[in-house]
């Protein structure tokens, strides 16, 4: 793959060059097939551990500050790197604001599911307000992210049965939203069976989500 020409800031071009230096062309072919919503030419082919390592190296640098302001990104790996940089933001307000600024540009499941600022775990009550907002979004991956945050942070000690209703109330024709709903309910069956099981036994979910939830629950026990 030839690197796309750029009129970006020098800091952004430098980071893009670092990504291309980590390129694995065979992995690019493999990874492109896993993300059918993305044009193959927007995937460089950098493995996730290397992206996370680069994010760690760039954290708190002026280059990273310029990079995260430069939206939209062209390459999948630029979005993934941006997501991993957000994970290290230590102030909750900043992490939330930057996540909300970034979410409209997320265009695939891999970036959507890969990140959550660590500080979110320390502010679960405050995060719920944002999650409700995300669930009502008209952006596919913003909704998916909201359901993912419910699954990540609110199926253990912070669980409340009403959160199941929040996820069930999301109505969408989008595959990547509905798959996350099914994943959420399958995980809820494992972690909060008393609350989650009636959603299946009483057939409260739509048929597709009901069936996919059972499928994912069975697969997770293999």
Task: For each feature predicted by the language model, list its residue ranges.
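Alpha-helical scaffold domains
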Residues: 2-222
């Amino acid at each position: 793959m030839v690197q796309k020409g750029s009129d970006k800031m020098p800091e952004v071009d430098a980071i893009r060059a670092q990504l291309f230096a980590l390129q694995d062309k065979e992995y690019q072919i493999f990874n492109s097939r896993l993300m059918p919503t993305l044009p193959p030419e927007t995937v460089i082919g950098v493995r996730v551990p290397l992206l996370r390592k680069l994010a760690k190296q760039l954290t708190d640098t002026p280059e990273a500050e310029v990079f995260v302001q430069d939206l939209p990104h062209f390459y999948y790996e630029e979005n993934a790197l941006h997501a991993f940089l957000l994970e290290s933001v230590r102030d909750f307000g900043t992490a939330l604001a930057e996540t909300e600024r970034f979410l409209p540009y997320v265009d695939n499941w891999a970036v959507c599911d890969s990140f959550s600022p660590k500080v979110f775990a320390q502010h679960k009550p405050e995060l719920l307000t944002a999650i409700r907002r995300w669930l009502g979004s008209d952006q596919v991956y913003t909704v998916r992210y909201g359901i993912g945050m419910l699954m990540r942070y609110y199926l253990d000690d912070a669980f409340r049965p009403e959160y199941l209703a929040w996820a069930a109330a999301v109505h969408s024709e989008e595959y990547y939203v509905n798959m996350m709903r099914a994943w959420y309910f399958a995980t809820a069956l494992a972690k909060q069976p008393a609350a989650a099981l009636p959603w299946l036994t009483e057939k409260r979910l739509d048929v597709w989500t009901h069936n996919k939830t059972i499928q994912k629950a069975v697969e997770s026990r293999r």
